[in-house]
Amino acid sequence: MNISQKIVSVRGTQIGGEQPCICTPIVGASMEQILSETEEVCRKRPDIIEWRADFFKDIYDPQKVLETALAIRKIAGEIPILFTIRSEKEGGNPVPLTETEKIELFTEVCKSRLVDMIDCELLYEEELASLRQVSKEYGIRMIMSYHNFSSTPPKEELVQKMLQAESYGADIAKVAVMPASPQDLLVLFQATQEARSQLSIPLITMSMGGLGVITRLAGWMFGSAVTFAVGQNSSAPGQIPIEDLKEVLHIVQKHMFHG
């Protein structure tokens, strides 16, 4: 399949091209913390910033969420913004919202066009179609994701999750798992490579924790389009400081492509 079919372009950033994108999370609890963190992160020039709104203490107030999104946009400029409410079940911070209220908030954020992408978990199966319709209408790219913080499921199951995301209309499929052994890392890499050959959309995969660090450094070689790095504060175990990640990617690519 032509690689151009697998590229998603957001504000000029190519997701799914030859180079992996670096995404850095924003995890502040207050608007003040979020904006301070955004300024610090943007100075380090990530390709994408992810606002983990499940850490925002005022997430129950849609107006405050939109005000904060606007303030983030003003700082981020043309850096693409990914809006995420990670569920507690999939490793997120507990939030005082029902599943319906979360979908309503995603909808309002899409309508505001203050962000470029949203990440919605595959577990919202019934709501995904209507949210996909809204995101398309307002030009917001949609990542559909699966996170397992306890284990690494078999390769076939991981590939199926990514195929499921594409069948639901995702622009990008994401899988994150927890390894218990180096063998689990191979499972993740094999699933990534296999899904890459079957999907017509970009995919993002990683193993978490210290053992999974290698997947954040080398996942792009198997087909993962984005890797997550720490700008100021981590949103998941095993994330690497953005400076270190950029340096390692530079060294590996320099010797891979230039001998």
UniProtKB/Swiss-Prot annotation:
HAMAP family in the cross-refs: AroD
Active site, UniProt feature: H147 (proton donor/acceptor), K174 (schiff-base intermediate with substrate)
Function in brief: Involved in the third step of the chorismate pathway, which leads to the biosynthesis of aromatic amino acids. Catalyzes the cis-dehydration of 3-dehydroquinate (DHQ) and introduces the first double bond of the aromatic ring to yield 3-dehydroshikimate.
A Gene Ontology biological process term: chorismate biosynthetic process
GO molecular function ontology, one term from the record: 3-dehydroquinate dehydratase activity
Keyword Transmembrane helix: no
Name the record gives this protein: 3-dehydroquinate dehydratase
Source organism phylogeny: Bacteria, Bacillati, Bacillota, Bacilli, Bacillales
EC number assigned by the record: 4.2.1.10
Similarity remark: Belongs to the type-I 3-dehydroquinase family.
Listed PANTHER family: 3-DEHYDROQUINATE DEHYDRATASE
Catalytic activity reported: 3-dehydroquinate = 3-dehydroshikimate + H2O
Known partners and oligomeric status: Homodimer.
Domain of life: Bacteria
Keywords for the protein's UniProt record, in alphabetical order: Amino-acid biosynthesis, Aromatic amino acid biosynthesis, Lyase, Schiff base
Pathway per the UniProt entry: Metabolic intermediate biosynthesis; chorismate biosynthesis; chorismate from D-erythrose 4-phosphate and phosphoenolpyruvate: step 3/7
CDD domains hit by this protein: DHQase_I
Binding site for 3-dehydroquinate: E50, W51, R52, R86, R216, S235, Q239
Primary enzyme class: lyase
